[in-house]
């Protein structure tokens, strides 16, 4: 009898290990990239290089999708089955009064037959029907434009302290430290020790329990009204203008997607990545920005002028530069190296009119090394 009990215990432990080792393989993850159209409702904002409504400039539609696409790519690599509400930009609900000539109705499919859904109740109904293992809605937030306010907030369906889809608070608490890990964002408040995690009714100033949708689920945010434990992530404030300029860099948005991936992967006990990342920002050592569309937090690193068009070289221990990154012209100074093997490296920075600079960096597996550095101008002797 004791022998049989031992065998049963071994079988149970083996099953437990198998389930824990499974990670994301076979999991169904639903990813909603918030917004979808090129309308005035899709958070267009002016930047130094782009007027408002310029699709090459800032639209939350665009930046949300960049984040979501990277997240979904990583999830699929890990064996998850991924459902996206949309995979393209420029889709609106039927009858959208603010639709532009660039927008199409959401029921249209792309060239691969992927239906594009942006109607929030339709998304909620699809999520409830699929009943995935995980749901996330990706957004960025807004305050008064030019305000220094910038923080991360995760919202779940319900009242603060009372999640209507049980398990949502747990998922928010687990995910928050991973998503928050980005010093470039220059957070003004909220941290892993004091996270902004809230019920959507409470945060949005609604009245509990909120209006029910066609499925009978109550709450405030339409996209969360389904049975799946979930949250909506306001990843940062695009009304904080330096952050808005960073969001014009697709690689910067991709790295937010990586942080979402790390949170979800860890939640399901997935294996950590074997490589790491280097993410940084390159600024002038002395010149302070002076532009009405670049209001920065007092005494922050954001006050300094980003260096456009610089070359950043990744140099190995042999002194060989084996990768390079060209900072864009969008006034952010962002540079990114992904899929970097763990080890010690040197970053070499070169830009016209500046002294060459080097920085040492250590890359760890499944981690991001952040580098915020400045370059000194060459002083003319004339």
Residue positions per predicted region:
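Active-site-adjacent mobile loop/cap segments within catalytic or ligand-binding domains
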Residues: 27-30, 41-44, 137-145, 155-156, ...
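Short, acidic Ser/Thr/Gly-rich low-complexity loop/linker segments typical of extracellular
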Residues: 305-308, 315-334
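A short, solvent-exposed beta-strand micro-motif common in secreted/extracellular proteins
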Residues: 343-353
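Solvent-exposed loop/turn segments at secondary-structure junctions
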Residues: 35-39, 58, 82, 88-92, ...
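Active-site histidine-acidic residue metal-binding/catalytic motifs
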Residues: 20-124, 148
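Hydrophobic core positions of the immunoglobulin-like beta-sandwich fold
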Residues: 336-338
């Amino acid at each position: 009898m004791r022998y049989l009990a031992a065998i049963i215990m071994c079988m149970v432990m083996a099953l437990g290990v198998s389930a824990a080792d499974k990670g994301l393989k076979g999991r169904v993850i639903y990813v909603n990239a918030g917004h979808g159209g090129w309308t005035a409702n899709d958070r267009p904002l002016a930047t130094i290089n782009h007027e408002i409504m310029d699709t090459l400039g800032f639209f939350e539609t665009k930046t949300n999708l960049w984040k979501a696409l990277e997240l979904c790519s990583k999830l699929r690599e890990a064996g998850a089955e991924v459902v996206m509400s949309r995979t393209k930009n420029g889709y609106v609900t039927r009858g959208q009064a603010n639709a532009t000539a660039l927008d199409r109705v959401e029921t249209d499919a792309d060239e691969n037959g992927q239906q594009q859904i942006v109607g929030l109740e339709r998304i909620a109904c699809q999520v409830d029907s699929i009943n995935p293992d995980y749901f996330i809605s990706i957004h960025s937030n807004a305050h008064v434009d030019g305000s220094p306010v910038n923080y991360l907030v995760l919202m779940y369906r319900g009242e603060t302290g009372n999640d209507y889809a049980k398990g949502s608070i747990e998922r928010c608490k687990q995910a928050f430290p991973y998503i928050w890990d980005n010093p470039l964002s220059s957070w003004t408040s909220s941290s892993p020790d004091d996270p902004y995690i809230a019920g959507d009714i409470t945060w949005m100033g609604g009245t509990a329990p909120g209006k029910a949708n066609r499925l009978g689920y109550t709450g405030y945010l339409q996209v969360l009204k389904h049975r799946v434990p979930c949250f909506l992530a306001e990843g940062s404030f695009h009304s904080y203008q330096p952050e808005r300029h960073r969001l014009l860099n697709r690689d910067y948005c991709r790295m937010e997607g990586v942080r979402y991936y790390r949170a979800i992967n860890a939640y399901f006990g997935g294996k950590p990545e074997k490589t790491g990342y280097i993410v940084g920002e390159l600024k002038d050592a002395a010149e302070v920005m002076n532009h009405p569309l670049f209001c920065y937090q007092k005494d922050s690193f954001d006050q300094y002028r980003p260096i456009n068009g610089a070359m950043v070289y990744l140099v190995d221990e042999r002194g060989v530069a084996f990768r390079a990154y060209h900072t864009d012209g969008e006034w952010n100074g962002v540079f990114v190296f992904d899929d970097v093997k763990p080890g010690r490296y040197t970053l070499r920075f070169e830009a016209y009119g500046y002294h060459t600079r080097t920085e040492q960096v250590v890359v760890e597996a499944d981690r991001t090394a952040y580098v915020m550095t400045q370059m000194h101008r060459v002083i003319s002797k004339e």
